[in-house]
Amino acid sequence: GLDAILEVNNEYPAINPSPRVARSLIQFPQTQILDTFANKVGASNWSSSLKLFIADAEGINADTTIKVYPVSGSWNNGTGQYLDSPITTNGVSWGSRFYSQSGDWDTAGGDYLTDYSASQVIGIRTVKDLNIDVGNIVTEWSASNIDNYGFMVKLTGSQEFVSSSAVQPILKYYSVDTNTIYPPVLEIKWDDSSFETGSLSEISTT
């Protein structure tokens, strides 16, 4: 949707206790990725990172682990925002890829390719911003080996659907619709430096 916040969490409320899991989808234009590699990176050594900037974090344990996967099917962003009333249902949801009751995911919560993944462990006293090496995923997109349907950002499997008040990390990151200067970034860095070897002539002392 158009909400300013992306959420990744496993919330376990005290009232009507049942795990409430949130995952986020982020997509960067394939045309920009291909252009970057064709016209800028070339044959240079490169690396790529997904950067998300934290807005709020609660319930972090010593080993809270964020996983990133490539989404395996198309989806519609929609125009909804948190706490819309009535609820806006014209975009991707836990059960549907496009809008309410249309184009269901094969697996509720979103379909993604498990052959490619990246992760970052967040600790109690560490920085909560994400800076995850996603080079293995971007490699496949840049070579058009897999379709670019964006990233799935989620907690690792063992930290989702946990019925315990001791395991309920709630992470909120700024989305592209934030009014801050901290939207998500797909950073691609490369080394295009070059050098020339010089030559020295012997200096005569006579």
Predicted feature residues:
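A short beta-strand-loop element at or near the start of a globular domain
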Residues: 1-59
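Cysteine-clustered segments with highest specificity for TGF-beta superfamily mature ligands
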Residues: 1-12, 29-30, 49-52, 90-192
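Short beta-strand/loop motifs in extracellular/secreted proteins, especially
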Residues: 24, 64-66, 184
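Extracytoplasmic/secreted cell-surface and envelope-processing proteins
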Residues: 37, 59-62, 160-167
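Short edge-strand/loop segments of extracellular domains
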Residues: 51-94, 155-159, 176
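Short helix/loop capping segments that flank catalytic or ligand/cofactor-binding pockets
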Residues: 77-79, 162, 196-198
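Activation corresponds to long, low-complexity, non-globular regions
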Residues: 196-206
